[in-house]
Amino acid sequence: MKRLLAIALLALVVVPAAEAKRLPKNYHLWIKMGRCEQPGRQWPGRIYWSHPGPTYGGGLGIYQGTWNAWKVKGMPSRPGLATWRQQMWVANRIAADVGFSAWSCWSRIR
């Protein structure tokens, strides 16, 4: 039983790292979402992945409380401190649970 638990816990850390080697699921959608969430930024067409917040952070404008609920142990404490791959990985978890409508831009990009 202890061995099974150890394997399950290891999978929580290793799976996100393994998935980081290829483009995240819904990659192109998240790029569109990031561009929509950050209109008029100083980098036209680019996404400011390290956006500090304070309420909505990172390139996808993830609410801090939502980030805390869906990130896994070992990930940065704030979305703006996470890599773009980590942000997309968490965003996919959010979308799988509550849908893409968690982002206000969803209605504009779909």
Task: Annotate each predicted stretch with a short phrase.
Residues 23-110:
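Peptidoglycan cell-wall recognition and remodeling modules
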Residues 1-24:
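N-terminal prepro-regions of secreted/extracellular proteins
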